């Protein structure tokens, strides 16, 4: 089971989240049939979204839109405060060769664009914030968003490692944030630690990457585990929801589906589940609409 662990330094000056999202990203790859680069880009976005949702309280939902002008198109993800996330990438077929060190390139194929977050508190007035893409590598873009939009200096590392067959081997990451009251010396100390940290891909390749991430962040310094939360890919789509969507269409469109198409098939963008509505189903909807 995937998990997110919330921690805080003994001094109370910093907090860190570390995540294992391997099963989540693996499931997303299976549902969307993504090729290598698309898998990594989508996976990083899902991880980033789970970090943002973990910062919220109550029954909030956070939507992340990574909107680029290059090969990937846009990536959309939605996460809630219960550890559930869903998402899709506009172009699942980007398959760029790895670098000499085995890294999968993402930034060059995201292009220029924006990192958009929409936080829904359930009050009917969602809050939207937009920052420019800095590198298109997702992790740096999330860190920039947190620092600029939420005014919380942050360091973020996240990645998806693939095996020889380009299947998800491991996925995860971390977020480190400065809390109010941190001294200049403490901030300087942690900045130096972050600069000296091994690459996120190296940490994820460790036998126990959760422990490796925590060790890289805190070293020998004491810290406290605040909570451990389970994470998973879970879509809330349903036949009833799509039936309601069909009901919202003009009657003429439903009649066209009935008489010309002999039915309708709706595919959920977020998870790929297909819902079939035969002629009898459409007749019921048309009658209910009358």
UniProtKB/Swiss-Prot annotation:
Chief subcellular location: cytoplasm
Subcellular compartments: Cytoplasm
GO BP annotations listed: protein refolding
The record's account of how the chain is modified after translation: Under oxidizing conditions two disulfide bonds are formed involving the reactive cysteines. Under reducing conditions zinc is bound to the reactive cysteines and the protein is inactive.
Annotated family: Belongs to the HSP33 family.
Keywords for this protein: Chaperone, Cytoplasm, Disulfide bond, Redox-active center, Stress response, Zinc
Species of the source: Streptococcus equi subsp. equi (strain 4047)
Disulfide links within the chain: 235-237, 268-271
GO molecular function annotation: protein folding chaperone; unfolded protein binding
Record GO cellular component, one term: cytoplasm
Gene label: hslO
Superkingdom in the source lineage: Bacteria
Protein name as annotated: 33 kDa chaperonin
One Pfam match: HSP33
Record's function text: Redox regulated molecular chaperone. Protects both thermally unfolding and oxidatively damaged proteins from irreversible aggregation. Plays an important role in the bacterial defense system toward oxidative stress.
InterPro entries reported for this sequence: Heat_shock_Hsp33 (IPR000397), Heat_shock_Hsp33_C (IPR016154), Heat_shock_Hsp33_N (IPR016153)
């Amino acid at each position: 089971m995937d998990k997110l662990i919330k921690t805080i330094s003994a001094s109370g000056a910093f907090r860190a989240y570390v995540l294992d999202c391997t099963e989540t990203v693996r499931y997303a790859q299976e549902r969307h049939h993504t090729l290598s680069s698309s898998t990594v880009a989508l996976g990083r976005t899902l991880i980033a979204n789970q970090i943002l949702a973990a910062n919220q309280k109550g029954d909030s939902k956070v939507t992340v839109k990574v909107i680029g002008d290059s090969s990937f198109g846009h990536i959309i993800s939605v996460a809630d405060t219960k550890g559930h996330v869903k998402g899709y990438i506009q172009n699942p077929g980007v398959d760029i060769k790895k670098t000499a060190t085995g890294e999968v390139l993402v930034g060059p194929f995201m292009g220029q664009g924006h990192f958009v977050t929409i936080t829904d508190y359930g009050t009917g007035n969602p809050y939207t914030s937009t920052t420019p893409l800095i590198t298109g590598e997702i992790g740096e873009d999330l860190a920039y968003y947190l620092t600029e939009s939420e005014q919380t200096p942050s360091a973020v590392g996240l990645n998806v490692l693939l095996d020889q067959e380009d299947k998800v081997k491991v996925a995860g990451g971390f977020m480190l944030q400065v809390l109010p009251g941190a001294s200049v010396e403490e901030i300087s100390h942690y900045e130096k630690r972050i600069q000296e940290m091994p690459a996120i891909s190296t940490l994820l390749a460790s036998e126990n990457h959760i422990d490796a991430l925590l060790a890289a962040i805190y070293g020998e310094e004491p810290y406290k585990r605040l909570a451990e939360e389970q994470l998973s890919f879970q879509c809330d789509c349903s036949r009833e929801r799509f039936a309601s969507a069909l009901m919202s269409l003009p009657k003429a469109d439903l009649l066209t589906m009935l008489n010309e198409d002999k039915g309708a098939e709706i595919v959920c963008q977020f998870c790929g589940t297909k819902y079939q509505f035969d002629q009898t189903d459409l007749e019921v909807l048309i009658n209910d609409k009358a």
